[in-house]
């Protein structure tokens, strides 16, 4: 009797299983439960996509629907894209589409549209990418009372660099840190960006703000007092601090630029004011810290001449370590914030392309 009952149950389950198959592609079958299961499924074919500042990217998103649940299409399909904040507490509207009605929000206006590769394609194309476009995006599809979501991460090729102003180390609250990065053609880095930089070899013994409001620093060679001598390498976390009162350095992130970074050939050394004017006379502007890091990391720029930058610092980029030119490692070498009246250095300029 027990064997007969088991056989009956297996037969019923098998029948239900076969009746709820909907073939959507040549090689894909999705199983939708007729009673309580999802009648709408949203998925991203890639969890992460990569691009760079100034480039274009497609955030993949497709939806699969049960044709028996929605009939002949009496419900309009609504597609909404939002950007998630780093703490996942808020969503920033990016794009909404319902039939012929479409709306774009904020800085995305004129830069985003649906790919529309097929009837079930909700992929979003973003053009002329900016540093602020980095992050996680949510694709939401709504039809009638059914809805589902998928999340796609947009990663940008770039470089993370530590920064502190002329005042010295540990002088920036969170909001000042954000502005300091913006002033240097960069944005405040995320934890993921700092973590990737650490995996790439970044070692820095001063704690800095990150975009989520945490304070951390990357150590590849633990030592006293940098992470502790007998500890493992890693990204050290100071935790979350008061954004108004607490003061640290900052980790900035920048990406490819649309222009030319170069060391200006000049017959004499320059004061800071002379350096600014020399770049202007050459049809350019004095370069920013983010631009020297991007040229060094992304273009392999190498120059063993110390030069003024826009923030009043003096630095030089070395991609090929050699005697008297950063012999131990490839790096952007920091000379300091000298007296701006000293006539001791050259200048790095940046000419933007139209």
UniProtKB/Swiss-Prot annotation:
Q: Which organism is it from?
A: Equus caballus
What residue intervals traverse the membrane? none
Can you give the residue ranges of the Link domain? Answer: 159-254, 259-351
Query: Which InterPro entries does the entry mention?
Result: C-type_lectin-like/link_sf, CTDL_fold, Hyaluronan_bind_Proteoglycan, Ig-like_dom, Ig-like_dom_sf, Ig-like_fold, Ig_sub, Ig_V-set
Q: Which family does it belong to?
A: Belongs to the HAPLN family.
GO CC annotations on file: extracellular space; perineuronal net; synapse
Q: List where in the cell it is found.
A: Secreted, Extracellular space, Extracellular matrix
Instruction: Briefly state the protein's biological role.
Output: Stabilizes the aggregates of proteoglycan monomers with hyaluronic acid in the extracellular cartilage matrix.
Spell out where the chain is glycosylated: 21, 56
UniProt-listed GO biological process terms: cell adhesion; central nervous system development; skeletal system development
Q: Which SMART domains match?
A: IG, IGv, LINK
- Name the domain of life: Eukaryota
> Which residues are removed as the propeptide when the protein matures?
1-15
GO molecular function terms attached to this record: hyaluronic acid binding
Q: What is this protein called?
A: Hyaluronan and proteoglycan link protein 1
Which cysteines pair up through disulfides? They are 61-139, 181-252, 205-226, 279-349, 304-325
Give start and end of each Ig-like V-type domain: 38-152
Which keywords does the record carry? Disulfide bond, Extracellular matrix, Glycoprotein, Hyaluronic acid, Immunoglobulin domain, Repeat, Secreted
